[in-house]
Amino acid sequence: SGSRWGLKGTEDLGNVKVGFQLESGFNSDDGASAQGGRLFGRQATVSVSGAYGTVYAGRLGSVSSDMGSVGMLGGVSPFGSSFTDLGTHGSTGSAWARYDNAIAYASPMIAGFYANAMYSFKADSKSVKEVKAAENKPEATRYAAAGLGYKNGALDAVLVFDYTLYGNDTTHLGNGWSVILGGNYDFGVAKAFAKATYFDNQTDAEDVFHFPVDADSHKLFNLKGWGASLGASVPVFGGNFMAEVGYRDSEDVEYHNIDFKRWNTTVGYNYALSKRTSVYATGGWVQEKLDAAAKIKVNRVLVGGGLIHNF
């Protein structure tokens, strides 16, 4: 998990509650702010909640992620975005990110169903290309997403759709979108996870190895393709053993002769020292192949561990 600290508060006004959440990510090695140097880059929102749900405004994680107050993909894998390159986002093509200038809605649960939605008027206020762009104008990249979830006993399932309207000053062929179906089922002796995704013209798909194909940015591949993952979590020796395999197959929609294939395999163990403190260790192998005029294959083995304390 990424290092962070935050402030959170609510006030009950009778029929509604108003609140705020400020969450700051930082690099524990040198104390520098993460998320592009933002003080509260993980989340910075005000909210109003009542019987019909909660409305958020500010900066927060997308519906098509496991982050923040409206992210819906936390239950599709035992390894979320906090596991960085080993996380399940490596086998998706969704805009798994945080967005500035956003408004979002989270519904109450009704008969096991719930829904989240969001819209960003300007996705990244610190982007060099969009720093002067006016909010909700064609020169600004805008983002919309909606998801439907269902929880009933041991079943937890979600369906999420997102759509990115790229700013006019970018060089993309068209707008991007993705759809993700996933969830988990608790069998008691083990919990099984699964996810499938299809995406088109996405530029925020995880690119760990930064193949030097697009001169504008190491991450701006206009990707089209699909991905899937299977995982499990099993109680072992007082903790949880976790494992997942993920695959993504995609091509660059601008340069059709460029294909990307990626495998993720991850294992981990989490052990609770108390109700608020736990330790974890992870390890995995990631392979990404690029088939173009030059063929590149990169393999990487990653290991890590950490301590989590919830205040």
Model-identified regions with their sequence ranges:
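Detector for outer-membrane/organellar transmembrane beta-barrel domains
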Residues: 139-141, 145-266, 271
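Outer-membrane beta-barrel "beta-signal"
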Residues: 298-311
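Structural signature of outer-membrane beta-barrel channels/translocons
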Residues: 8-12, 49-51, 106-109, 149-153, ...
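Residue-level detector of the transmembrane beta-barrel scaffold of outer-membrane proteins
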Residues: 17-21, 54-56, 114-116, 156-158, ...
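Outer membrane beta-barrel
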Residues: 1-123, 140, 148-156
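Membrane-spanning beta-strands of outer-membrane beta-barrel proteins
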Residues: 2, 39-41, 98, 110, ...
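Outer-membrane beta-barrel pore domains and translocons
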Residues: 23-25, 60-64, 118-122, 151, ...
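Outer-membrane beta-barrel domain signature
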Residues: 29-36, 89-96, 127-137, 167-172, ...
